[in-house]
């Protein structure tokens, strides 16, 4: 039971009950036939995707979804990488020395 502000009023008593969604019935041929015909009608009326409240045009710079499927293997390199560095494991490059950080002693002096 959930108590609400209305419970403080004398002489009234309300009980809040959570509702459940109806469950699908499987195995019955008649209900399966009815549910498919009803669901096909619902699918025609429903809006499929996007933002139905504020429809905005697609920007010119945005690629279509088909562009990603039509790319050849040589064009599928990362856009933001330099071609010489793309896919390299770093074996042929000069090794960088690791420079450990010097400990900061400013906090120790204050204590």
Swiss-Prot record:
GO terms for cellular component: centrosome; nucleoplasm; nucleus; perinuclear region of cytoplasm. One of its GO terms (molecular function) is chromatin binding. Its main location: nucleus. A motif (D-box) lies at residues 23-34. A motif (Initiation motif) lies at residues 85-97. There is a cross-link at residues 15, 24 (Glycyl lysine isopeptide (Lys-Gly) (interchain with G-Cter in ubiquitin)). A motif (KEN box) lies at residues 78-80. Induction: By UV irradiation. By ATF3 in response to UV-stress. Expressed predominantly in liver, pancreas and placenta. Not detected in heart or brain. Highly expressed in a number of tumors, especially esophageal tumors, in anaplastic thyroid carcinomas, adrenocortical carcinomas, and in non-small-cell lung cancer lines. It is found in: Nucleus; Cytoplasm, Perinuclear region. Monoubiquitinated at Lys-15 and Lys-24 during normal S phase, promoting its association with PCNA. Also diubiquitinated at these 2 sites. Following DNA damage, monoubiquitin chains at Lys-15 and Lys-24 are probably extended, leading to disrupt the interaction with PCNA. Polyubiquitinated by the APC/C complex at the mitotic exit, leading to its degradation by the proteasome. The modification Phosphoserine is found at residues 8, 28, 31, 72. Residues 28-40 have a biased composition (Low complexity). GO terms for biological process: centrosome cycle; DNA damage response; DNA replication; regulation of cell cycle; response to UV; translesion synthesis. Residues 72-81 have a biased composition (Basic and acidic residues). The modification N6-acetyllysine is found at residue 24. Keywords: Acetylation, Cytoplasm, DNA damage, DNA repair, Isopeptide bond, Nucleus, Phosphoprotein, Ubl conjugation. InterPro entries: PCNA-AF, PCNA-AF_dom. Disulfide bonds: none annotated. Overexpression in adrenocortical neoplasms (ACC), may promote growth and invasion in adrenal cancer. Interacts (when monoubiquitinated at Lys-15 and Lys-24) with PCNA. Interacts with isoform 2/p33ING1b of ING1. Interacts with BRCA1. The PIP-box mediates the interaction with PCNA. The KEN box is required for the association with the APC/C complex. PANTHER family: PCNA-ASSOCIATED FACTOR (PTHR15679:SF8). PCNA-binding protein that acts as a regulator of DNA repair during DNA replication. Following DNA damage, the interaction with PCNA is disrupted, facilitating the interaction between monoubiquitinated PCNA and the translesion DNA synthesis DNA polymerase eta (POLH) at stalled replisomes, facilitating the bypass of replication-fork-blocking lesions. Also acts as a regulator of centrosome number. This is PCNA-associated factor. The lineage of its organism: Eukaryota, Metazoa, Chordata, Craniata, Vertebrata. The gene is PCLAF.
């Amino acid at each position: 039971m959930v108590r609400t502000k209305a419970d403080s009023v004398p002489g009234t008593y309300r009980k809040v009950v959570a509702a459940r969604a109806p469950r699908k019935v499987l195995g019955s041929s008649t209900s399966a036939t009815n549910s498919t015909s009803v669901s096909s009608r619902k699918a025609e009326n429903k809006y499929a995707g996007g933002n139905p409240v504020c429809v905005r045009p697609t920007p010119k710079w945005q690629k279509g979804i088909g562009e990603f499927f039509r790319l050849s293997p040589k064009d599928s390199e990362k856009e933001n990488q330099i071609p010489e560095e793309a896919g390299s494991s770093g074996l042929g490059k000069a090794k960088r020395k690791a420079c450990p950080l010097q400990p900061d002693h400013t906090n120790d002096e204050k204590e």
